[in-house]
Regions:
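Conserved beta-hairpin
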Residues: 50-94
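Hydrophobic alpha-helical transmembrane segments
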Residues: 37-50
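A structural detector for beta-sheet-dominated domains
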Residues: 10, 72, 79, 111, ...
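Hydrophobic alpha-helical transmembrane segments of multipass integral membrane proteins
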Residues: 23-28, 48-55
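Acidic, Ser/Thr-rich low-complexity segments on the non-lumenal side of membrane proteins
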Residues: 83-115
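N-terminal membrane-targeting/pre-transmembrane regions
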Residues: 1-38, 129, 159, 163-165
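A membrane-cytosol interface segment of integral membrane proteins
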Residues: 112-165
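Short edge beta-strand segments in beta-sheet-rich domains
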Residues: 66, 103, 125-127
Length: 165
């Protein structure tokens, strides 16, 4: 089987811009609150620390959402070649309403635990689960999750008739 790219999942420019705007606005509002309120030194230090963390996450999201996730015949990969999950390690794809998943995304369950990783707005890896989505376009994420479910069904040799995707 060749390692050809089936589909790519990129950040939606509108969703990315809105998410960055909200995070940066929150960070600057916290800094403004620190400057204008009459609070104790420890409260101000706490507000500055939270503002710095929010602005750092906004910068991490800005850098991370310039990339894309690829679904290849061998698995899920980030644009720089980082392996998210191999097809042989994936047990199922969850996209339901009550699934613990990113906004407009899906969750991939793995056979074994993986290293933790997180790119805000694109994906997170924790334990034996990978959440993909956030600032991505819902239609692209749905297509990728459906295609991944078909690849898993083909690997297991099961019929897709009656399968709930």
């Amino acid at each position: 089987m060749s390692d050809s790219v089936i589909t790519q999942l990129k950040a939606s420019p509108v969703r990315r811009g809105f998410a960055l705007l909200v995070m940066m606005l929150l960070g600057f509002l916290l800094l403004y609150l620190t400057m204008t309120t009459d609070a104790s030194f420890f409260h101000k230090v706490f507000l500055v620390a939270v503002a710095a963390a929010v602005l750092w996450m906004a910068r991490a999201m800005q850098r991370g959402t310039t990339g894309y996730i690829e679904l290849r015949t061998t698995g899920l990969f980030f644009e720089n070649g980082r392996t998210l999950a191999l097809i042989d390690d994936i047990t199922r794809v969850e996209r339901g309403v009550f699934a613990f998943k990113p906004s407009n995304g899906f969750v991939v369950s793995l056979k074994q635990k993986t290293n933790r990783a997180w790119i805000p707005g694109m994906y997170w890896k924790f334990g034996a689960r990978i959440g993909i989505g956030g600032v991505t376009a819902p239609s692209d994420a749905k297509f990728m999750s459906d295609t991944l479910a078909v690849l898993i069904a083909e690997r297991e040799g099961s019929s897709l008739m009656g399968m709930k995707l």
